[in-house]
Structures are given as structure tokens and as C-alpha cells.
């Protein structure tokens, strides 16, 4: 089993940006002490939904502040920045940390990012594929060049080269079927969403495995991650109530982030994400409190045993043994750390990998 910690860097209304940044550093260090394998940093722009416009910089700080902890991005919006510049940053982190950096990528969800950074969001799928191939080749070859409809530049060395053999490990935040299929074609591990239930997670892994095998990948050694909003307390109601105010503001902040520009919903290629929201509303979850209650049904929020039951059910359904939690909904930094430590002592030791049964005929 492996355990990760998502550091959201959401700014609640009652806290300053300076306080959120202090939390980031402290929680990163505490994560290492609590036995977490990796902390994950999210890229967001122009919104208090997440204060990290450049996760590479934050990753560099946390890698320098820790000794064994891996630090990853979950995720870099790959199409919105030049691929050479991105690989330079990834390789630098890979070298300076001696292989402790994890390169999580995504296609991007927010129209605002593409518009401000001058990238056509309607081309996000094609750009994701093009940028990924350039970066992957650059990791192994040590140079990059491009001459296609999306980008043109002459052959250049990418320095420093990668420290890790084959380059820093790459992960994909995958929410739609199309992104799941894309990740499977390339044999890349997925970070699964915390907003889907066990059946959806199982179906996503089954789709991935089917496609990955068609492309010749060994599906038994792919380090997929299950992600969760997490709050652990011996009092179940206390765990739920302490998260409610944070999650309510956080959800509202997410909605605001997706609609900074009035015509954001006209972008092509995001029908799954729009449909997911429509389905959510049809199920009666438009009310913020109902959305929070539904989140409690599918995330480890409650007593240690309740948390174990929810996570173990997903492990058994998917076979995934890399568990990534976000604890920031727990209130103050001291309350967050208390929940992390209780998770370490009363949840981590009792989660088990899915048992693989073999049958022999004698």
C-alpha cells in the first residue's frame, strides 16, 4: 500500500493567502512524518479555488524541505505552456530531488486558463497528444524538435537531462472516458476522481485495462491512484460537520472558477464534464449541502472504521493500492494535522491490497 496527500491550497474566506502558503509548507513536511509517500500539488489560476499558479515552484520548495517525500503535480495543464520549457522544469526537479518528482498532467478543464494564456481550448486533445509525445521523446532522447500544425522549432538539447531512467514518472488526471482511453493507450497511470462512486471507478479501470491490453501494456504494474476528500475523527458527526463549511465554500469556488467568462460552456470537447454536472443536478445535488452529503457517501469522512470501509471497498473493486487523500477540509492547520495523524495510526495499517487468487488444477 502507498499513501499520498493532496494539498489543495484553497483559500477559505476566513484565512489569508499568506496563511494558506504557510499551511502548504507545514503540511508537506508533516506528510513525510506521517508516512505519506507523495504529496500532490494542483495547478489553478485566477481563483481562490487553488492558489498555485506554478506547482513546479512549490514542488521545488517542498522537495528541498523534505528528505524522502515524493512531490507530484495533479496536475499540470499540459497544453497551456511550451513543451520545451515544461520538460526543462521537470528534468530540473527530477535531477535536484534525485528522482522524487512525479509529473502529473491533464488536458485542462477551465476555459479561463486557455483564453488568458493564448491557447485554443477546442484543440486541447490534439495539443495534449502532441505535447506529451514531444516531452516523452525529450525525456529519453535528450533533445526536442517539432514540425507540425501545432508547433514548429528546430532541434535543441534539453538540459539538464532526466535523472530517472526514462524520465520522471508521468501520471494522468482522468475523469472522462476519452482521457481514460488516452491514458490506457500510452500505458500511463491514472489519478481517479474523488467525485465518482465505486461502480464508476470499477468501470473506469475495466475500460482502461481493456484498451491498455490492446496496446500491449502490462496492466498489473500500473500505479493508478484513488483520490479522496478525507476527515477522520472518533466522532463521525464531528468529522462531517467540521468539513461542511469548507466544502460548501470550496464547491461554490469551483463553480465560480468554471464561469469566470460567460461563454465558457461553449467550448467543444467537454461534453462529459457538462453532462456530469447535469446528472448531478438531476439527482438533486444542486443544493450545496446536498452535494456535501453526497460527498460523504463516497469519501472517507467519519470514524476510522468508516474510512477503512469506504477505501477498502474501492481497493477491492479496482485493485488500486495507491490511496491519495486531501485533508484540508478539516479546519485549522492543527485540526488538519490531527486528522492526518489519526489516519496514519487508525486507518493506514488496516487497509489491504486486493487479494489476487490463483487456482491450480492438480
From Swiss-Prot:
Cellular component terms (Gene Ontology): cytosol
Disulfide-bonded cysteines: none
Pfam families for the chain: Bac_luciferase
Known partners and oligomeric status: Heterodimer of an alpha and a beta chain.
Main enzyme class: oxidoreductase
Keyword Flavoprotein: yes
InterPro entries to which the protein is assigned, alphabetical: Alkanal_monooxygenase, Bact_Lucif_Oxidored, Bacterial_luciferase_CS, Luciferase-like_dom, Luciferase-like_sf, Luciferase_bac/NFP
UniProt-recorded name of the protein: Alkanal monooxygenase alpha chain
Family: Belongs to the bacterial luciferase oxidoreductase family.
One of the protein's GO biological processes: bioluminescence
Presence of the UniProt keyword Manganese in the record: no
Miscellaneous comment text of the record: The synthesis of this protein is regulated by a complex control mechanism that has been termed autoinduction.
Enzyme nomenclature, EC number: 1.14.14.3
GO MF terms, alphabetically ordered: alkanal monooxygenase (FMN-linked) activity
Entries under PANTHER family matching the protein: BLR5498 PROTEIN (PTHR30137:SF8), LUCIFERASE-LIKE MONOOXYGENASE (PTHR30137)
Gene3D superfamilies, sorted: Luciferase-like domain
Recorded catalytic activity of this chain's protein: a long-chain fatty aldehyde + FMNH2 + O2 = a long-chain fatty acid + hnu + FMN + H2O + 2 H(+)
Function statement: Light-emitting reaction in luminous bacteria.
Segments forming a coiled coil: none
Keywords for this protein: Flavoprotein, FMN, Luminescence, Monooxygenase, Oxidoreductase, Photoprotein
